[in-house]
């Protein structure tokens, strides 16, 4: 069974993330969305909320599981019996960073492989940071995040 982990902070999950999840779920037998606890950032949503939002927008995908983790990604993969890291790429700048991370992860565990998936062109500009910025100033986020969570993002952005 090919089990992959798609890690990220997903704060909030965007349509670009969902695109990678939907496409990745067709490539792997099981896709675990690893929602990371980033102690260096104060998130828009708490970790438990992010997990629930992702579950809400991925409930139609049967081979997806959503879990939170902290610590090393490699340790999370081992605990999940996964050998593959799935990463979405928007631009060359993403590749430079992710390539270095893939090399580090492979150094920590040579059995781990990183698979890069290009984001669909219509989402190549999209990031959680840009969604938060637009929502904070009252801009329209339709088409940027899944429709099921638009009200959650707007409500939280006004706090």
Curated annotation (Swiss-Prot):
NCBIfam families on file: coaD_prev_kdtB (TIGR01510), cyt_tran_rel (TIGR00125)
Stated family: Belongs to the bacterial CoaD family.
Residue numbers binding ATP: 9-10, 17, 88-90, 98, 123-129
E.C. numbers: 2.7.7.3
Cofactor: Mg(2+)
Alphabetical list of SUPFAM superfamilies matching this protein: Nucleotidylyl transferase
Name this protein carries in UniProt: Phosphopantetheine adenylyltransferase
Gene: coaD
GO molecular function, one term: ATP binding
Binding residue positions for substrate: 9, 41, 73, 87
Database matches in Gene3D superfamilies: HUPs
UniProt pathway annotation: Cofactor biosynthesis; coenzyme A biosynthesis; CoA from (R)-pantothenate: step 4/5
Enzyme class: transferase
Record's function text: Reversibly transfers an adenylyl group from ATP to 4'-phosphopantetheine, yielding dephospho-CoA (dPCoA) and pyrophosphate.
Coiled coil: none
Organism field: Clostridium botulinum (strain Eklund 17B / Type B)
Site label Transition state stabilizer, positions: 17
GO biological-process terms attached to the record: coenzyme A biosynthetic process
